[in-house]
C-alpha cells in the first residue's frame, strides 16, 4: 500500500508521479511550492515576519493541486525559463490564480519589485549617501544615477518616478515572447503601471526645479 504523501507547505497536494519534483520540470515544482509558501507564510509565519507585504496572500483552490498548476504553466507555448508574477497584471494583487498571474522573464519580474526593507526610510528610488539625496533606477540590469544631487527626498523621488514611467513604457513597447507568455495583457498592464508612476511625479511637479529625464 502506497503511503499517503504529506501535504506540501501544509496545504498542497502533490499528485504528480514520484520523482517529478527532482526531474526536468523541477523549476515548475519549485514555483508551485513557492506560491504555497507565500500563501501560507511558512512555518510559524516566518516568511511574513521577513516580508510583511505578503501578509494576506492567497492561492486559488485549483492551484493547491500540483497537476492543475503544471497544466496552467504548460498551456503557454513559451513557459520554459519564466517565473510566475502576481503583481504586473493587477497592482497590489495578493491572490495567485490564472486570472491574476502571468509567466514572465526574471528581468521583467524584477521591473516592478519594491524593496522597501532595503531602501529603509526613503521613498522608492531614493537614498542619502551624504547630506544630499540621490535618485537611482535599475535599468537593463544596472543601477543608473539620475541627474544631479537633490536637496530634498521629494525632488529625488519625483526624478525617480519620471524615469520609471519612461522605462516602463519602453518595456511595454518592446515586449517579446522572451519576456512574457501573454504579450497583450502584459503590455496593457505595464502601461497602467506607467500611469501610476507618472501620476506620482506629476503630483509633486509644483517645484521650480527641473526633473532630469531618463532618455534625454
Where do the protein language model's features map onto the residues?
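Extended, polar beta-sheet/loop recognition surfaces of beta-rich domains
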Residues: 4, 9-11, 108, 116-118, ...
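Structured segments of extracytoplasmic/periplasmic soluble domains
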Residues: 38, 72, 163-166, 170
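Short, cationic Gly/His-enriched loop motifs
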Residues: 19, 23-24, 31-42, 46-138
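Charged, amphipathic alpha-helical interaction segments
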Residues: 106, 140, 161, 165-168
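A short, exposed loop/beta-hairpin motif centered on an aromatic-Gly-Thr core
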Residues: 57-61, 142-154
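An aromatic-rich alpha-helical recognition segment common to small helix-rich domains
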Residues: 69, 126, 135, 150, ...
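Plant transcription-factor regulatory intrinsically disordered regions
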Residues: 6, 11-28, 52, 60-71, ...
Amino acid at each position: 500500500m502506497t503511503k499517503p504523501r504529506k501535504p506540501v507547505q501544509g496545504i498542497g497536494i502533490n499528485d504528480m508521479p514520484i520523482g517529478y519534483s527532482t526531474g526536468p520540470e523541477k523549476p515548475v515544482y519549485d514555483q508551485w511550492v513557492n506560491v504555497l509558501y507565500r500563501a501560507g507564510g511558512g512555518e510559524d509565519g516566518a516568511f511574513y515576519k521577513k516580508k510583511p507585504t505578503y501578509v494576506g496572500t492567497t492561492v486559488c483552490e485549483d492551484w493547491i493541486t500540483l497537476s492543475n498548476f503544471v497544466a496552467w504553466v504548460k498551456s503557454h507555448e513559451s513557459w520554459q525559463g519564466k517565473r510566475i508574477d502576481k503583481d504586473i497584471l493587477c497592482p497590489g494583487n495578493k491572490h495567485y490564480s490564472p486570472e491574476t498571474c502571468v509567466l514572465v522573464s526574471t528581468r521583467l519580474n524584477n521591473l516592478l519589485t519594491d524593496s522597501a526593507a532595503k531602501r529603509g526610510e526613503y521613498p522608492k528610488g531614493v537614498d542619502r549617501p551624504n547630506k544630499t539625496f540621490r535618485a537611482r533606477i535599475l535599468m537593463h540590469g544596472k543601477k543608473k544615477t539620475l541627474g544631479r544631487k537633490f536637496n530634498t527626498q521629494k525632488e529625488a523621488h519625483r526624478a525617480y518616478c519620471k524615469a520609471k514611467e519612461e522605462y516602463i513604457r519602453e518595456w511595454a513597447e518592446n515586449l517579446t515572447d522572451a519576456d512574457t507568455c501573454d504579450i497583450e495583457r502584459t503590455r496593457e498592464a505595464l502601461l497602467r503601471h506607467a500611469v501610476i508612476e507618472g501620476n506620482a511625479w506629476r503630483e509633486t511637479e509644483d517645484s521650480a526645479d527641473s526633473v532630469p529625464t531618463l532618455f534625454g
